Amino acid sequence: MAMKRNPSRVFCAYSKNGTHRSAAPTTHRCIAGGGRGALDAGAENTQGHPESRCFPGGRPPQTGPSWCLGAAFRRAFLIDDAWRPLLEPELANPLTARLLAEYDRRCQTEEVLPPREDVFSWTRYCTPDDVRVVIIGQDPYHHPGQAHGLAFSVRADVPVPPSLRNVLAAVKNCYPDARMSGRGCLEKWARDGVLLLNTTLTVKRGAAASTSKLGWDRFVGGVVRRLAARRPGLVFMLWGAHAQNAIRPDPRQHYVLKFSHPSPLSKVPFGTCQHFLAANRYLETRDIMPITVV
């Protein structure tokens, strides 16, 4: 593709011969590889993509970073292939390209949690066909070292946050004789078929709800709708108004449990919640193995 000299900035990507086009100004940025770094005109672009194009003048179209489609997207976030049928319809939506472009831009200017490899970690613990219970959260913990891609859960070596402490108290209320580990890592739940999914998958360090308008809720909502259509008979635990408004499963097809949020500020003490016991009783009536939460 021929390019004329233009005094304005030119965003260019990988040209056919593997180098930036010499006609580009010396101050331009490359959108290949997620838009990272500026290269001089004619310099070799080692992170380019052979199908990318040069876009003269101003900013490139809102197509998202180069890893936002198909296999490249799954590799960038270490997404398990079993979730591909549920995720790929969202990738075809132009709004997802804008979401990922903004996510990538923010990653270059601020600390975004959890780390990229953990944003979709929930896809790696169980397949869609193994999910039996869905617990909906809001957004990740915003302090470093806490969030690892599972709603409410923290890493094993991190102190248990207040909301999660109340969730564990509810488990103890359902199973008084259970011996609790006292840790807040819920990976065992996830491997056992509990989908712990926030409606917003990222957050700026130290700023709760800072990415709530980014578009993750639309993306996550689409994935949950496809999962619900594919798997009738799921148990949904919706805690608080946010979860109950964000995700609306059909109660004729699923067992929908609602309660106040486990925050210590809630009027109704979450420790009295009987959802875990109710969920297992429901699963047993359908000859489905109950979940193990202790």
From Swiss-Prot:
It catalyses: Hydrolyzes single-stranded DNA or mismatched double-stranded DNA and polynucleotides, releasing free uracil. It is found in: Host nucleus. GO terms for molecular function: uracil DNA N-glycosylase activity. It comes from the Viruses. The keyword Hydrolase applies. Gene3D superfamilies: Uracil-DNA glycosylase-like domain (3.40.470.10). InterPro entries: UDG_fam1, Ura-DNA_Glyclase_AS, Uracil-DNA_glycosylase-like, Uracil-DNA_glycosylase-like_sf. SUPFAM superfamilies: Uracil-DNA glycosylase-like. The active site is at residue 139. Its EC number is 3.2.2.27. The keyword Disulfide bond does not apply. Keywords: DNA damage, DNA repair, Host nucleus, Hydrolase. GO terms for cellular component: host cell nucleus. GO terms for biological process: base-excision repair, AP site formation via deaminated base removal. Pfam families: UDG. HAMAP family: UDG. NCBIfam families: PRK05254.1-5, ung. Excises uracil residues from the DNA which can arise as a result of misincorporation of dUMP residues by DNA polymerase or deamination of cytosines. Therefore may reduce deleterious uracil incorporation into the viral genome, particularly in terminally differentiated cells which lack DNA repair enzymes. Belongs to the uracil-DNA glycosylase (UDG) superfamily. UNG family. This is Uracil-DNA glycosylase. It comes from Human herpesvirus 2 (strain 333) (HHV-2). The lineage of its organism: Viruses, Duplodnaviria, Heunggongvirae, Peploviricota, Herviviricetes.
